[in-house]
């Protein structure tokens, strides 16, 4: 058994395969600025995700931040979003000088509660920014219906949902844009990286300029942009990892099924549900939620500590919820967020990666059983 079991482990191709992939870079000396591998990866990912347009970025955060910027929302406008997400989602709104309006979530799947969105809409609302949390897909139809009714943009944070589908339609086809993260901790990684999927060809041109300092031509800088270009080493890693993605997903599924088999029947613990036949899952996370009413409000933290004593590292995703982050707590509109806070207080994400040994899953689940029962 490994000495240390981390919550995740980066997927990597065979070493020699990656070396051969990057060897031509020593000949071309073209290391960034939309090189050959960058262009090739955009084509391959468009095909894999089944989306009409795709723009690669240096990371998922910049993909989201620049997409919001590209929409051209007036300063001070409001974007309705979830507080149960990684802090990057909220930062991207605020860094664009916009106002996050937090909407509570559903405890069934931890995604934004679409039935509570409409009551939060004001004359300042310009967009909805839902998150496919842990790969659980939002109610895209109802969210789009609301957006159409009020003429709002929909930007999905799909960082947890790369490669997922709804009835054979790639997740990147919903809303006005979908953001993906290719961070080293994700199911699919380019070491660091991200992308935006969308339909509007004009948005591609806008994002192309924005990720290159706003430069439109050698002598024209048309807008204030950023340096958000993916480099060739990351693109090469992405091309290599794409070959092994299905193998990676299959191994993750096997381990999730083993977790569920070992933990099913424990009434103090809510397990994730991957049984929706309309969804093609990619199994990025294994979150469990402790029933505070049955096992106490501190059980999640206690289990976390017990695992850590055995050199097993789980994560409290997402605690605190972004609405309670110290950097902007109490700065924005107060909305009841009981479900989001309950989830933040009681969810623990367990280790999951293709090479995770089943003997380690046995140890993890035994610790959980002994602790809660």
Where do the protein language model's features map onto the residues?
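PLP-dependent aminotransferase class I/II
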Residues: 36-44, 48-52, 115, 127-131, ...
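N-terminal "arm"/small-domain region of PLP-dependent enzymes with the aminotransferase-like
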Residues: 1-31, 351
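Conserved active-site segment immediately N-terminal to the catalytic lysine
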Residues: 156-190, 217-222
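Glycine-/small-residue-rich active-site loops that bind phosphorylated ligands and cofactors
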Residues: 85, 108-109, 135, 186, ...
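Active-site PLP attachment segment
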Residues: 173-209, 232-235
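Phosphate-binding glycine-rich loop
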Residues: 30, 34-78, 92-95, 102-104, ...
């Amino acid at each position: 058994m490994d000495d240390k079991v981390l919550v995740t482990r980066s997927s990597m191709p065979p070493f020699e395969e990656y070396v051969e992939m990057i060897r031509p870079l020593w000949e071309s000396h073209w290391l960034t600025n939309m090189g050959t591998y960058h262009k090739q990866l955009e084509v391959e990912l468009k095909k894999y995700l089944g989306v009409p347009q795709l723009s690669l970025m240096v990371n998922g955060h910049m993909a989201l931040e620049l997409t919001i910027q590209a929409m051209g929302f007036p300063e001070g406008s409001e974007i309705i979003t979830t507080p149960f997400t990684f802090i990057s989602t909220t930062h991207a709104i605020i860094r664009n000088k916009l106002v996050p309006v937090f909407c509570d979530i559903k405890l069934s799947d931890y995604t934004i509660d679409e039935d509570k969105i409409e009551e939060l809409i004001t004359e300042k609302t310009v967009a909805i920014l839902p998150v496919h949390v842990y790969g659980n897909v939002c109610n895209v139809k109802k969210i789009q219906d609301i957006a159409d009714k009020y003429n709002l943009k929909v930007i999905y944070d799909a960082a947890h949902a790369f490669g997922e589908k709804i009835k054979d339609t790639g997740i990147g086809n919903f809303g006005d844009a979908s953001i993906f993260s290719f961070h080293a901790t994700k199911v699919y990684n380019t070491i660091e990286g991200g992308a935006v999927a969308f339909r509007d060809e004009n948005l591609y041109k806008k994002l192309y300029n924005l990720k290159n300092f706003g430069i439109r031509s050698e002598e024209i800088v048309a807008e204030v942009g950023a340096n958000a270009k993916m480099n060739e080493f990351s693109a090469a890693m992405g091309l290599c990892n794409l070959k092994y993605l299905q193998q990676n997903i299959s191994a993750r599924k096997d381990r999730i099924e083993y977790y569920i088999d070992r933990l099913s029947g424990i009434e103090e613990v809510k397990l994730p549900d991957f049984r929706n036949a309309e969804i093609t899952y990619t199994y990025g996370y294994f979150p469990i939620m402790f029933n505070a009413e049955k096992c106490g409000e501190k059980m999640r933290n206690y289990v976390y500590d017990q695992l850590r004593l055995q050199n097993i590292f789980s994560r409290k995703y997402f605690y605190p919820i972004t609405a309670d982050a110290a950097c902007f707590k109490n700065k924005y509109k107060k909305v009841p967020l009981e479900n989001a806070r309950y989830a933040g207080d009681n969810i623990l994400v367990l280790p999951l990666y293709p090479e995770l040994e089943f003997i380690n899953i046995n140890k993890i689940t035994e610790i959980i059983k002994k602790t809660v029962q």
